[in-house]
Amino acid sequence: MILKTAFSLPTPTTTLLSPSSPHQLNTLFFTRRRRRLISPSRLNSIFSQRRFSFSAAASGNNVFTSPETSKTFDFSSEEKIYKWWESQGYFKPNFDQGGSPFVIPMPPPNVTGSLHMGHAMFVTLEDIMVRYNRMNGRPTLWLPGTDHAGIATQLVVEKMLASEGIKRVDLGRDEFTKRVWEWKEKYGGTITNQIKRLGASCDWSRERFTLDEQLSRAVVEAFVKLHDKGLIYQGSYMVNWSPNLQTAVSDLEVEYSEEPGFLYHIKYRVAGSPDFLTIATTRPETLFGDVALAVHPEDDRYSKYVGQTAIVPMTYGRHVPIIADKYVDKDFGTGVLKISPGHDHNDYLLARKLGLPILNVMNKDATLNDVAGLFCGLDRFEVREKLWADLEEIGLAVKKEPHTLRVPRSQRGGEVIEPLVSKQWFVHMDPLAEKALLAVENKELTIIPERFEKIYNHWLTNIKDWCISRQLWWGHRIPVWYVVGKDCEEDYIVAKSAEEALEKALEKYGKDVEIYQDPDVLDTWFSSSLWPFSTLGWPDVAAKDFNNFYPTNMLETGHDILFFWVARMVMMGIEFTGTVPFSHVYLHGLIRDSQGRKMSKSLGNVIDPLDTIKDFGTDALRFTIALGTAGQDLNLSTERLTANKAFTNKLWNAGKFVLHSLPSLSDTSAWENLLDLKLDKEETLLSLPLPECWAVSKLHILIDSVTASYEKLFFGDVGRETYDFFWSDFADWYIEASKSRLYGSGGNSVSLASQAVLLYVFENILKLLHPFMPFVTEDLWQALPYRKEALIVSPWPQNSLPRNVESIKRFENLQALTRAIRNARAEYSVEPVKRISASVVGSAEVIEYISKEKEVLALLSRLDLNNVHFSNAPPGDANLSVHLVASEGLEAYLPLAAMVDISSEVQRISKRLSKMQTEYDALITRLSSPKFVEKAPEEVVRGVKEQVEELEEKIKLTKARLDFLKSTTSLVSQ
């Protein structure tokens, strides 16, 4: 029966094998003839005689190789294929077929970056999306670019200058910035070229850099607009401060590590009382910044002290209030908390809530300032040791006990980050966050996987104002100017240029004013938050690209920057363009090592993508990465890469077989007949022999399933389903079955059908796999005859093509019969080269279609073609045969004497049975020992019991086989 699905997806262009006029099939075309089996040596001979080479579209440029001439796919050809794609303009959006554009802004890697597995992950996933949509006829734009990476780039250049004995401050700002630009021009393209190695089919003609003139204009425009709305302000607030870099850093640039340390117990005298309150702290050096002691309001131990004051040690009698607040954890330390709001994020928030003063005791280089008295000028960690010694000397040190610390360290350099109150520029986030929350709530924005919506909502609901200023020289200079002589926090000018700022200053203060620009630059994430629309021409809303491609369709990135980048892009997109910048967000996880550990240099488990490409090929790496699940971490191992390299080789070898099997190009008549077979038409499908009908039907089912998975972004399902179909159905079954038709004596008609099916199925497999494995599939595609276009732009297979469910069931019966015979051969150790006889028994209906595939069955099962018999009743020598049940209504009998030397087999199985029995007895003895059962780990005992059960089943089956052999021996002797 023929089934057609109602599944609806974007309709691709008609394929090469699907002309507008349907072919009327000649009913005599598929006449069946008896054919003989061909030996492997004969097949090789035929292969050699029928070899031919097809000219590829770019063969003149030596771009492509062919399985006809190359034993394996040559990884070195990947670069040539990539350059050819790019030279043909395939990466640019093509509006010829109409349709709505598919647009992805590439997450811009740092210009200082070197390719790592995180890059490989996002490039693979985004390229899959882009290639799939391109093949579906949509104009695709994958817009690439790099980030200026303020801190990282400045550090790289400073290090380079240091090797020359030059300091940044000696050069001055302008000269240093010039040197950074020179470095960028020389080395900035490294990461771009490495991304190309991964096969990224992005439009490099539109490549952007966050410090490009146009993007810089967008940054200034955004700052001015936000300031004009009162959303940007300047103030002194708590930030993450890098003492070495002398700048504020973002939360993402702070990594917390669990490290051994101490919890210091220190006594504070209660003023006007002989009593002391003992606090516990991990940072005694900050006590100079204490502004209060806090206890829990329900802690009866300290309730009588609330409202009194305490004297801070080593501060010459400075008093601080003793307060009560539920923020205090009664069970931590002593239950008394010192409040140092100038040097602790939580203390800072509590002080702001309660109106406590903020006292800073640190200089920007992490030495203590004059508030610390005698400790002024000493490093914070040196003060910790000296202060504790002094406290011990005066009797205020109670004890210090080992304690695991959660230490904030800089992502760059590893220094300990200092919470510090500093004058910075901030964005007021609450009004922006409200709109971003509504975007998800109103389904304007879909986050994949859905579970990350909760994290997104939590972050935006509890959002803090964003510190956007950095004390660096490399980056977008903050568009704020000050008037010389009027330096105060409130007296500044925001303008789009120095000329505009001077004009405003003259207007405000009259003649003879001198202005200077704020020395700080903007946080790199500020320019990145504008990326989806600044790269398309904004703030010029009339720009062609902005109108054609904004808003974009998809933002794909790691789940770790959902807040730092994705949420900020959503907020800025809504604020400046009135719409979400992308309709979908696809989040991937981390790539870990084979043991599930995060890759790090310290562990020595970092896998280099470029080394991986060299050893396994880009396609194997991409396929391995793509088999993951959205939002989940992926464990990467050489075993997986090796397996998928083998998959690449299997594809190549299948291509070699298909090419060998096709008619010679000089045989134009054969090619006309072959191309005239429209295998996506129902009438053609119904006329195919069973194996061919099965293969095409299974392919059509696969196309629907895989296309649906592509649409749902279930890439792991796409990879697994296509892999299984290619390897199990096509390579293991259909290619093997086709050999009985291609190289036998049955004439050209059935051979032509098999050739057409081989080509049709293989070319569609290449299409389905191309987004995952672009290089090997394009190379194989170009080797196939009559290719009118490159695979990268060939139409996606059509959906809802016919399939014959009955043929699938029938071929599955043939497979079951083949497996049963193969298993019997293995069980009785029949030599692979030996052809055996068989009697196939089944109903008249089953025998009718199975017998038509006698040659296929004989080839796949290694049967003697002249001694394969079909009947609806068991043979006369059934009691001397191995009885196989393949499926309901389909059985087989294999004459035992023709298969093996029965007496030798009896001896062999008897030895095996004896060995099994010995193993079984030993296990039973262990289980009979109370000492073992009572003292051995539970899982060990359970494992032994499972071995016993397994052996019992094996012994039972082996005894049955031995009894059968012995009974056969006695019957034969009679």
Curated annotation (Swiss-Prot):
E.C. designation(s): 6.1.1.9
Traits of the deletion mutant: Embryo defective. Developmental arrest of the embryo at the globular stage.
Keyword Transferase: no
A molecular function (GO) term: ATP binding
Residue ranges of coiled coil: 489-518
Binding residue positions for ATP: 601
Sequence motif: 'HIGH' region, positions: 109-119
Keyword terms, alphabetized: Aminoacyl-tRNA synthetase, ATP-binding, Chloroplast, Coiled coil, Leucine-rich repeat, Ligase, Mitochondrion, Nucleotide-binding, Plastid, Protein biosynthesis, Repeat, Transit peptide
Database matches in HAMAP family: Val_tRNA_synth_type1
Similarity comment text for this entry: Belongs to the class-I aminoacyl-tRNA synthetase family.
Name assigned to this protein: Valine--tRNA ligase, chloroplastic/mitochondrial 2
Organism this protein belongs to: Arabidopsis thaliana
Gene of this entry: EMB2247
